[in-house]
A protein has these predicted regions:
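Conserved, well-structured core segments that form or line functional sites
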Residues: 2-213
């Protein structure tokens, strides 16, 4: 582990892979099987609101999946899920947190990847201020913590992830060799048997430790 440091002097332990400067992702990246996109998003960069980092944990959801919002069909709330790939699907969870998802597959498919955690690398001071007195490893280690840290709100539902204010970039630097492991999804009551949680192996920034094999 190495450490990034905010201007306030707060050290943040990192994997040592460094801050990647990959190329921006395009719509074709998201216009694929949601499970392939989920696995490939691990190690990619995510920036928004003056903060961001590298995606280290995601989960995939599809309309045929009982845990997916689209399982019950199209509604006003989930309409963005049925739109084009590369859009942000943001929803308010349990009246507490905004959660950020990336819409995937061709229009009408209703599939998305939930961004569960990032390793914070950019704009540490801004994220620390938004999160309060959070410990560095707690800044973005959960889908609600993440959106609070970078400032994603419900009004960003339907925004494109392919253009400002979002910036999602391909794996670069040491992250091109990231090992991705899968496990059952967490925080849901249906579809718990599917191994559609994808994480960067050995990351200290996951929302919850991976189960022991």
């Amino acid at each position: 582990m190495s450490a990034a440091r905010s201007t306030s002097g707060t050290a943040v332990a990192t994997t040592g892979a460094g801050a990647p400067e990959g190329r921006p992702l395009d719509e074709a990246f998201f216009d694929r099987s949601v499970h392939d996109v989920a696995r490939d998003l691990v190690g990619c960069g995510l920036r928004f609101g003056g903060g961001g980092g590298v995606i280290v944990e995601v989960e995939s959801y599809h309309a045929d999946d009982p845990a997916c919002h689209a399982y019950i069909g199209r509604t006003q709330r989930n309409a963005v899920l049925f739109d084009r790939p590369g859009l942000a699907y943001v929803y308010f969870s349990y009246g507490v947190h905004n959660l950020l998802n990336a819409v995937c597959e061709p229009p009408g498919s209703a599939a998305a990847v939930l961004i569960r955690a990032i390793e914070p690398l950019w704009g540490l001071d801004a994220m620390i201020e938004r999160r309060g007195r959070a410990q560095p490893r707690e800044l973005c280690s959960g889908p609600g913590k993440l959106t609070e840290a970078i400032g994603v709100e419900l009004r960003h539902n339907g925004a494109s992830l392919l253009e400002p204010p979002f910036e999602v970039t391909a794996r670069a630097g040491g992250w091109e060799r990231v090992e991705v492991v899968s496990a059952p999804r967490i925080g849901i009551s249906r579809g718990v048997e599917y191994p559609w949680r994808f994480c960067a192996a050995g990351s200290a920034f996951l929302s919850r430790p991976l189960p022991r094999s």
